[in-house]
Every structure is written in structure tokens, then in C-alpha cells.
Amino acid sequence: MEENLERTESLAREADDCHPIFRIAPSTVEFNKLRKRLLRHIRQAFDDFSMLSSGKKWLVALSGGKDSYGLLALLLDLKWRGLLPVEILACNLDQGQPGFPKHILPDFLNSYQIPHRIEYQDTYSIVTDKLVHTQTYCSLCSRLRRGNLYRIAREEGCSALVLGHHRDDVLETFFMNLFHGGRLAAMPGKLINDEGDLFVLRPLVYAAEEDMEKFSQAMQFPIIPCNLCGSQDGLQRNAMKEMLKDIERKMPGRKDTMIRALTNVRPSHLLDKKFFDFKNLF
């Protein structure tokens, strides 16, 4: 009894040391372990991809989904603890989707005094005008969104755009490229855009989607569903997601093994002559 009381008091003290966004988080051992695990994954990505050398001001994309909310909260936590020496600017791009609740994100960000910018660009009409209803919108929508986020990052003097893609997104993209694109490619933890003036960072590349889902529910984020792409059936990414779920169900731990494989590439054991000089192999 006394030991449990001490543990509860310890968790309460630790909660007081967190960013204000965590003040409604549960004071439980389970949540504390989850938060620490996610922070550990992020710090590992920082180290593996030298993310902290990516400038002093980051634009963190906030869609209103579980992953971007979670990423923002965890980055703010690290900054609060003095472990992330960068300025953070949250940014939501309102793409003109019908029924998009315009008040939710500003209210959320203002309630915690989080620096932010809300930008309106009607890319929804562009996507629906250019594509017939049988085509998937995700690719074009993503390109338009990314272009606008690059512009905003430049206008705000940011050196990096930070995105909320997690481990499962990386694996789904890898298999989409493998099955449908005929190439070995996934999502890097860090890259430079085509213009060469902005970094793109993905601090959640080692974080499991399941953990992000649990974290989001515990934090009670006001989630905004994607009415544009979520209403379409038969998307390739959904098929990859279900395939990976089935693999993980039958062989637990395979997703982590796959991520390790993406960090352990042997060009000499593949068939791409651009990356290994087979001709001069004697």
C-alpha cells in the first residue's frame, strides 16, 4: 500500500515536470512507460539521422490526426526538458475539405500557448477537379500539401519541416514501392528537399502505430478525421497495412525486424549495378 502511494506520488511529480500539454495525461505506470518508450524512439532517431544538426527552427506539420498531435506533444516535452534546443512552430494547412472543423486546432494550440500558424489553401478543389472519382486522391493531395508546407517553412524562417510518419508508415511505403513501383524505397528519417534549402525530418520512424494510437487516446487529443482520402476504398496503402498486421499477428516482432533490415542494407547482395560495381568484380 505504502509502495503504491510512493509510486503514485513519484508519477505525479514527474507529470509536473512535463510540458503543460501533459497535465491531463493519466498518472499511471503504463502511460509513463509508453511516453518514455516513444521519447526513447525519437531520441534514437535524432542520433541515428543527426536531426539536431538540422537548424534552430522547425516547422511541425499538424494535420489533426493522432500521429501529428503525438509528435508535437513529444517534441514539446523534449524541449521543455532542455533536450531539444530548437524553436518549434506548429502549422496546420486547412485544405478546404468539406466539413473541416476550423476551430479545433486553433483552440487546442491556443489553450497551451503553442506558437503556430494556420494556413488556408483550397487544394481540395484542385484534387477533385483534376481526378475522376475512381482515382485515389492521396498522392496529389500529399504533393500539394508538401509544396505549401515548404513555402510556409521558408516564409517563417524554418530550416526543417517535421512530419509525423511512424514505423508502420515507413514499412507500408516500402511494400507499396516493392509491389507496385518495382523499386526498393521507403521513407528516410532525414532528407533534403529538391531545392536543397530545407530538411525533412521524421522523428517517429522507430515508433509503432499502435503506441501512437494508445498515446493519442490517453492524451485525449481532439482528432480530426480525413474526409478526403479516408472515404475511398481499396487504397494500396490500406492493403499493405492489413498485410503487415497479418504478418505481425502470425509472427510477432516482424515489424521491428523489417525496420532493422532497412538500416542494414547490403548493396552487394542486391541487383542494382548503380550501387555496386559488379563489372569490376574480379
From Swiss-Prot:
One of its GO terms (molecular function) is ATP binding. It holds the Pfam family ATP_bind_3. One of its GO terms (cellular component) is cytoplasm. A motif (PP-loop motif) lies at residues 63-68. Gene3D superfamilies: HUPs. Pathway: tRNA modification. Its EC number is 2.8.1.-. [4Fe-4S] cluster binds at C138, C141, C229. It is found in: Cytoplasm. Keywords: 4Fe-4S, ATP-binding, Cytoplasm, Iron, Iron-sulfur, Magnesium, Metal-binding, Nucleotide-binding, RNA-binding, Transferase, tRNA processing, tRNA-binding. It catalyses: cytidine(32) in tRNA + S-sulfanyl-L-cysteinyl-[cysteine desulfurase] + AH2 + ATP = 2-thiocytidine(32) in tRNA + L-cysteinyl-[cysteine desulfurase] + A + AMP + diphosphate + H(+). Its cofactor is Mg(2+); [4Fe-4S] cluster. Binds 1 [4Fe-4S] cluster per subunit. The cluster is chelated by three Cys residues, the fourth Fe has a free coordination site that may bind a sulfur atom transferred from the persulfide of IscS. GO terms for biological process: tRNA thio-modification. It is an enzyme of class 2 (transferase). Belongs to the TtcA family. Catalyzes the ATP-dependent 2-thiolation of cytidine in position 32 of tRNA, to form 2-thiocytidine (s(2)C32). The sulfur atoms are provided by the cysteine/cysteine desulfurase (IscS) system. Homodimer. The thiolation reaction likely consists of two steps: a first activation step by ATP to form an adenylated intermediate of the target base of tRNA, and a second nucleophilic substitution step of the sulfur (S) atom supplied by the hydrosulfide attached to the Fe-S cluster. This is tRNA-cytidine(32) 2-sulfurtransferase. It comes from Bartonella henselae (strain ATCC 49882 / DSM 28221 / CCUG 30454 / Houston 1) (Rochalimaea henselae).
